[in-house]
A protein has these predicted regions:
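Acidic carboxylate-rich catalytic motifs and surrounding loops in phosphoryl-/glycosyl-chemistry enzymes
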Residues: 21
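Charged, amphipathic alpha-helical segments and their flanking helix caps
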Residues: 1-18, 35-106
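A short, hydrophobic beta-strand-centered structural micro-motif
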Residues: 28-33
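Transition segment at domain starts
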Residues: 24-25
Length: 106
């Protein structure tokens, strides 16, 4: 799996989704995927296996658990264990839910 595969899977759920940021803000709800850092497996003083730490960010003007459940079910289906963090962005007047996970070899 690559981050592009994930973006396509999220789009198939009906959410606008892109890497990084949109050129113009889409209608809500929408998602972005971002690379956070690498956590490669290292052996014999070299990077043995690529392990990328990514974030899937979901934005909506209301707290809407059915959308979150769709995303969580898809991440589980794709076997991407995740941690979830939620906040309200006052300046944007949006809820933000961040799913953090690793993509190995992608």
């Amino acid at each position: 799996m690559t981050y592009m595969d994930l973006i396509n899977e999220i789009k198939a759920l009906g959410f606008p989704c892109t890497y990084g940021s949109f050129k113009s803000t889409p209608s809500i709800p929408f998602c972005t995927v971002n690379f956070a850092y690498n956590n490669d497996m290292i052996a014999d003083n070299q990077n043995y296996q690529d392990v990328g730490q990514y974030q899937l960010e979901y934005y909506n003007s209301i707290k809407y658990p059915p959308d979150e459940q769709k995303i969580e079910s898809k991440l589980k289906e794709l076997r991407l264990p995740y941690a979830k963090v939620e906040t309200f962005l006052d300046s944007e007047d949006l809820y933000q839910v961040i799913y953090e996970f690793q993509i190995i070899g992608g």
